Amino acid sequence: MEHIHIAIAANSNYIVPSTVLLQSIFEHNKENDICIYLLYLEGSLSEAETAGIARFTEGRGGRFRPLCIRPEQLADFPETRHGKAALLRLCLPAMLPEVDKILYLDGDIVVKDSLAELYATDLGDHYIAAGKDTCPVYHPERMPLLGIDREHWYFNSGVVLMNLKAFRGIDLPAIVSRYAAAHYDFIESPDQDALNFICAKRTVYLHPRYNMNYAVEKDVAAETWGADEVKAAKRNPAVIHYIGPVKPWSVRCTHPRRKDWWDCLERTPYAGYRAADDTAANRISTCMRIPLKAIENRFTLSGKRKLGKMLPGTLTRWVKKCLGK
C-alpha cells in the first residue's frame, strides 16, 4: 500500500469543489493510504466546515489533518498585489517537518486514476515535479520580465509534487521576498511565478495526463507537451485540471470534460447542487458558445493570427464576444 500525502487549500467558497476533488481522489485510490492536509487561512473556514471535510475524508477511509495558517506564520512572506493567501502552499516545508514530499492539488480538479505512480516520481534533488504551462508559447515576453531562466519551461502549479526535504534546505521566505520585491509589477500568479523562479533547472516535468490545459490550439499543445503525449492525455487523463476563470460548477463553462465534475458531484453529499449562475440566459449563451468553441479549437494559433490580420476589427471583436473572451 502506497502512503500518499496530499495537500489542498480551501475557504468557505470552495467547500463544494473541494469535496468533489476529495471524492474523486478516494474513488481512484482505494488501494492507497491517503492523508489529506487542509490548508486554510485563519478565519476563512468555520469549525463546522472544517469538521465536515474531516468527516468526509475519514468516511472515505482517509486520514485528515487541518493546517490553519495564522497571520504570524505568513509574516516572513512578502505582500503581493494578490495578498498573502496565494502563498499558503509555501508554508508546507516548515509546517510538516516529518514529511519529505507532498502532492499539492488545486481545488478545481477531478482525479480520474490512481495517484500512486505520480507520487512515486523520483525527485532526486529536484524541488518539484509539475506539468508544463502554455504561458511560454502565448506570452514568451513574460519570462524575462519574471526573471525566469530561458532554459526553464514555465510550469503550472495546480498539480505539484513538492520535495519538502529539499525546500527545507533553503530560506524559502527570504528568497520569495527578494523575488517579489524585484518583480512586483510583473507578478500575476504569486506562488506559481515564485516557484518557477526558485525551481528553475530543478524541476521534473510530468506527463500531460496529470495536468493539461484542454482549451488550447493544436500547435500550442504540440509545442508544449508533444502531439503524441497530448493524444494520450486526452484519451486517458489521470487528473483533469479546469484551468481558467470559468470553472465547471458554472453553467457558462465550455470545458470538454465539464461533465466529469458534475458526475462526481452526484456521488457526494452535495448531489443535486445547482450552479449559482444557473439562469436561462446563461444556459442559452453557453449552448451557443460550445459549438463555436469546438470550431475555434480546430484552428492553430498561427492560423488564427493570420486570420485575425485579414478580418475587419468589428468582426474580430464580435467573434471574441461570441466566444466569451
Task: Describe the residue ranges of each PLM region.
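A short, conserved beta-to-alpha structural element at the edge of catalytic cores
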Residues: 128-148, 254-255
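A glycosyltransferase accessory/donor-loop signature
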Residues: 1-4, 10, 169-325
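Short internal beta-strands
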Residues: 34-42, 130-131
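Short loop->beta transition adjacent to catalytic acidic/histidine clusters or analogous donor-positioning motifs
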Residues: 4, 29-37, 64
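Short, surface-exposed amphipathic charged segments that create phosphate/polyanion-binding patches used
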Residues: 76-86, 143-147, 220-225
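N-proximal low-complexity "stem/linker" segments adjacent to membrane-targeting elements
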Residues: 1-27
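Active-site-proximal specificity loops/subdomain of glycosyltransferases
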Residues: 49-50, 55-95
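GT-A fold catalytic core of metal-dependent nucleotide-sugar glycosyltransferases
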Residues: 66, 70-71, 85-138, 156-168
